[in-house]
Every structure is written in C-alpha cells, then in structure tokens.
Design a protein with these regions (language model features):
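Non-catalytic interface/targeting segments
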Residues: 1-54, 61, 86, 90-131
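Mid-chain, well-packed structural core segment of small domains
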Residues: 58-91
C-alpha cells in the first residue's frame, strides 16, 4: 500500500495537511517499507476549496495520509477518494509510524485499516449462542 506523510524534512510527520509544501510517499507491505519519493505542492492563488481538491487529487493511489492536523472538509475529500486521513497531533518520526503499521498488518488490523486496505475485518468477538 502507498502512504503519504505531510513532512517538511521526510523524517517526521510535522505539518498540517493543508499547509505542507510536500508529502513523502512510502510503499509498504507486511514486511518491507521504502520511501519512493515525494510530491511538492505548488503554491498559487485560488480558492481554498480548489487547493484542497488539488491536494486530494495529487494523493490519489495512496491508502493512508498522515498529518499533524487536517480540517473536516479536507478529510472528507480524501475519504471520498478512498484515502484514510490520520492525525498524529504531535511530531512523530515516520519510521515509528511505519513500524506501528507493520505490527498492525502482521496481527489483526483495526477495522479502519482493514477497510482502507480493502480487507474484510476479522471478527473480534464470538457471536452469542442461541438458547
């Protein structure tokens, strides 16, 4: 799966989704993860709505997007493109997030991750027996 990280340096998630100048892109599976590059956001004049839509289009093909903050309209535009937005609220090293994701993928992924990856979430409970 492809993951985008809002980052000023490619080392940590440290930018707001709508204010970052670049997103660092990683490809990963259960065992490996590699940075495959970055995409830069072109500045310019225009409506905020247009800028959000341009960012969402730029990240098509990603499964997840990490940022420190993201507004509701921006998150909705990502979700409409089947991209799950995730917030860190504090600066977090990208490698730490990758390792957490690997752990989740090798275990029982939480429902939001299973859905984002197109997997059917496994049951986490046993149905009650009928009396």
């Amino acid at each position: 799966m492809k993951i985008a990280f809002a980052s000023s340096d490619g080392l940590a998630v440290n930018r707001h989704f709508g204010l970052t100048e670049s997103y660092y892109l990683w490809e990963m599976d259960r065992n490996t993860a590699i940075c495959v590059g970055s995409v830069s956001v072109e500045g310019g004049e225009g409506e905020m709505e247009d800028k959000i839509l341009a960012r969402a289009r730029m990240l098509e093909g990603c499964t997840l997007v990490y940022s420190m903050q993201i507004g509701g309209p921006a998150a909705a535009k990502l979700v409409a493109r089947h991209i799950q937005p995730l917030k860190t609220t504090t600066e977090v090293p990208i490698r730490d997030l990758i390792e957490k994701l690997k752990g989740a993928l090798n275990g029982r992924p939480p429902p939001w991750l299973a859905k984002a990856m197109g997997l059917s979430p496994e049951r986490t409970f046993e149905p009650a027996e009928e009396e």
